[in-house]
Swiss-Prot record:
Recorded name of the encoding gene: murG
Coiled-coil region: none
EC number: 2.4.1.227
InterPro entries reported in the protein's UniProt record: GlcNAc_MurG, Glyco_trans_28_C, GlycoTrans_28_N
Name of the protein this chain belongs to: UDP-N-acetylglucosamine--N-acetylmuramyl-(pentapeptide) pyrophosphoryl-undecaprenol N-acetylglucosamine transferase
Membrane topology field: Peripheral membrane protein
Annotated pathway: Cell wall biogenesis; peptidoglycan biosynthesis
Binding site for UDP-N-acetyl-alpha-D-glucosamine: 10-12, 124, 183, 283
Lineage, top ranks: Bacteria, Pseudomonadati, Campylobacterota, Epsilonproteobacteria, Campylobacterales
Keyword Membrane part of the UniProt annotation: yes
Main location as per UniProt: membrane
GO cellular component, one term: plasma membrane
CDD domains according to UniProt: GT28_MurG
């Protein structure tokens, strides 16, 4: 028995691949990885001991591209699919798991050509174009969101790494706010943090700001101009995000699925600012269920005024009829919403098929 994991491009897809690879390793099952030279795949897995072999194809996505660029991208995808077909055959792969993203294309199609069972994990509440096409052809589609076209869909807990659960805690007071710009940096969140920093620090609230590597120098300059650089924690990125989340009492974040469920597992109340240009507005739908259950606050990017942060802080500090702060209630309920061992459940479901 030997697995192929494929897909990625961004940290959200890749974190799922990592969680599944860790579970395969725990169960003593060998795995290879097939991704792309474009995006973050190599950064995550080029030297990863989780895989016996790693392959990266010259492929790109087709979303938001001109007609001719789409044709070029599809040609590269087709070329890579035939290479992937030979790789899967060489390694005698018995199961393929796709975590989505454009880099999943070649190995997913190659698996179908080789008649290797294909399993898909759809991370978002709205399917990406590749997963929409491949879903009917897959053995099973795992997701933490309920889809109307149930078919071969399996509802599972999101495959969050156990460290997010291990570092969870119940929040009782807002003393520390985390601004999470993400691996690519979110300009709107970076600006929101800078606008609120003077008042927050004056109130004695600590700030940790992860602004993304491309924005680091500019954001650092503005904190310096505000005279706050030595009063806040600023990072381009951080390798130990679980420890950073553990210290925070409130987070401001985009609404990529992995971030949403990692924050949920950590019990960290969050203000989500969905990326307005995400395909099919999927970031908004990723947190819609949470918002309906009063487990988060969602602020559209075009309504992101500094006063919004303090409005949310006031609401979180209010108490219910039993005398419990909304902050504490939300923190507790978030931890109850997601079960540990989502990756284990997915792998065991595949093995029992």
């Amino acid at each position: 028995m030997k697995f192929a994991l494929t897909g990625g491009g961004t940290g959200g897809h890749l974190s799922i691949a990592k969680a599944l690879a860790i579970e395969l390793e725990k169960q003593g099952i060998e795995a290879i990885y097939l991704g792309s030279t474009y995006g973050q795949d190599k950064e995550w897995f080029e030297n990863s001991p989780l895989f016996s072999e790693r392959y990266f194809f010259n492929t790109q996505g087709v979303v938001n591209k001109s007609f001719f660029k789409k044709i070029g991208s599809l040609f590269l995808q087709a070329k890579a699919a035939f290479k992937a077909k030979e790789i899967l055959k060489k390694h005698q792969i018995t199961h393929t798991i796709s975590v989505g993203g454009f880099s999943a294309g070649p190995a997913s199609f190659a698996s179908l050509l080789n008649k290797i069972p294909l399993y898909i994990h759809e991370q978002n509440a709205i399917k990406g174009s590749l997963n929409r096409y491949l879903s009917p052809k897959a053995k099973a589609v795992f997701s933490s969101y309920a889809f109307k076209d149930k078919g071969n869909h399996v509802l599972t807990s999101y495959p969050v790494q156990n460290a997010f659960f291990d570092f969870a805690r119940t929040r009782t007071e807002i003393k520390h706010i985390l601004f999470l710009g993400g691996s690519q940096g979110a300009k709107a969140i970076n600006e929101f943090a800078l606008l609120n920093a003077p008042k927050l620090t004056k109130q004695g609230i600590k700030i940790t700001h992860i602004c993304g590597p491309n924005s680091y120098e500019q954001v650092r300059f503005f904190y310096q101009e505000l005279g706050l650089l030595d009063k806040i924690e600023l990072f381009a990125f951080h390798n130990n995000i679980t420890e950073i989340m553990h210290r925070a009492d409130l987070c401001v974040s985009r609404a990529g699925a992995s971030s949403v469920w990692e924050l949920c597992a950590n019990g960290l109340p969050t203000i989500f600012i969905p990326y307005p240009f995400a395909s099919n507005n999927h970031q908004y739908y990723n947190v819609l269920e949470f918002e309906k259950e009063n487990l988060c606050y969602v602020v559209p990017q075009n309504e992101l005024l500094p006063k919004k942060l303090f409005e949310v802080i006031r609401k979180l500090n209010q108490k219910d009829d039993q005398g419990n702060k909304n902050l504490t209630t939300i923190s507790n309920q978030l931890q109850q919403k997601i079960a540990k061992d989502g990756a284990k459940t997915i792998i065991e479901t595949i093995l029992s098929a």
